[in-house]
Amino acid sequence: SVAFKAGVKEYKLTYYTPDYETKDTDILAAFRVTPQPGVPPEEAGAAVAAESSTGTWTTVWTDGLTSLDRYKGRCYHIEPVAGEESQFIAYVAYPLDLFEEGSVTNMFTSIVGNVFGFKALRALRLEDLRIPPAYSKTFQGPPHGIQVERDKLNKYGRPLLGCTIKPKLGLSAKNYGRAVYECLRGGLDFTKDDENVNSQPFMRWRDRFLFCAEAIYKAQAETGEIKGHYLNATAGTCEEMMKRAIFARELGVPIVMHDYLTGGFTANTSLAHYCRDNGLLLHIHRAMHAVIDRQKNHGMHFRVLAKALRMSGGDHIHAGTVVGKLEGEREITLGFVDLLRDDYIEKDRSRGIYFTQDWVSLPGVLPVASGGIHVWHMPALTEIFGDDSVLQFGGGTLGHPWGNAPGAVANRVALEACVQARNEGRDLAREGNEIIREAAKWSPELAAACEVWKEIKFEFPAMDTL
């Protein structure tokens, strides 16, 4: 037998395996690697594979007590990034046994927990993950999914409409409830707590829940439609979060909300399990995502966070607008929107999808378009996102010159007009403005909204390019 050979050896001798055939059960990752000058890409890719699986900086005696071949991550392919001098895409395969079942927390701790501070790399970005069915099947996934949500709400054949209540901080619970009522009464399906509304001195959570529940029931009785308000259950401890979710269920409201990145995946998964068991829909806000996903060469792409959310659980998630005030490049946004909604997504590098992803039968998540959108955007949004989406107009509802309810009316009229035009076979991309103008002729509320926002544009070149 060979004696134990101490010392430091190059990662690529063990962890760079270009001949490796990936298994159907492997978790595959695509990293954008920017090595330090003088570090060959193979070594950098192998270093990532090693440090995010079984390796450490030196050979250890206890390596002899396990089978590295069975457990090590492998960098199995490296390709240069077109148009970038020193960037490479490194593909890494991880054996399934490295991960705890049903834990997004553990998956991220393993894959991205340690390697991002690595000295041999100037920068590192996780672009995409392939989650094998063998792993995704250990998760509950979204509490209900798209079809069940439509059945609960009895709303079919169109996108859903929402509105974030503004000013986001400072309203009393009673005035907050009033704004909720006016929006729902005007024709919206949902209103939403802002992500930073938790339980502050000016409005404690229990007061808000009570007033919002009253607003929901009153609006439902008057419109004959099912209404909802995303009650933000995010809290400082998991116990407090569950307490809020339980109170929401006792009030009989249809939906609660959670900030899944700031709240953490462990808390989110617990809440998702509770929501399925108790018939609550779960709206997910992605506060803090840009800290992780905005840099092009470091961090994680949002499509990875979106996949993680589908596993951890949520029925809605914010996913950019393509047209409003926040970032989002069209093809790339549509790429992860499909990853949220569809069962099977083909690899398509033009949309940033590095791997074919088969979700089997995991329920889908509704993408939420929100941020700086208004009635003039409605045709584009209807065309880009299709029926299975939630369109959220915060300022685009509450900023209406006549008040909240007319603002809601304007949005609902615009949406119904766009859906009808599309169903009649008209081209929303080309005739969008015309469709809105026609509808405005018989809806004074819409006409007023059109007048206010006719000049507003948030035009900056998008940063998320391929």
Curated annotation (Swiss-Prot):
HAMAP family: RuBisCO_L_type1 (MF_01338)
GO-annotated cellular components: chloroplast
Family the entry assigns: Belongs to the RuBisCO large chain family. Type I subfamily.
Organism expressing this protein natively: Betula nigra (River birch)
Keywords for this protein: Calvin cycle, Carbon dioxide fixation, Chloroplast, Disulfide bond, Lyase, Magnesium, Metal-binding, Methylation, Monooxygenase, Oxidoreductase, Photorespiration, Photosynthesis, Plastid
Biological process annotations from GO: photorespiration; reductive pentose-phosphate cycle
Function, in words: RuBisCO catalyzes two reactions: the carboxylation of D-ribulose 1,5-bisphosphate, the primary event in carbon dioxide fixation, as well as the oxidative fragmentation of the pentose substrate in the photorespiration process. Both reactions occur simultaneously and in competition at the same active site.
Full protein name: Ribulose bisphosphate carboxylase large chain
An example Gene Ontology molecular-function term: monooxygenase activity
Taxonomic classification: Eukaryota, Viridiplantae, Streptophyta, Embryophyta, Tracheophyta
Positions bound to substrate: 114, 164, 168, 286, 318, 370
Reaction(s) this enzyme catalyzes, per UniProt: 2 (2R)-3-phosphoglycerate + 2 H(+) = D-ribulose 1,5-bisphosphate + CO2 + H2O; D-ribulose 1,5-bisphosphate + O2 = 2-phosphoglycolate + (2R)-3-phosphoglycerate + 2 H(+)
Modified residues (N6-carboxylysine): 192
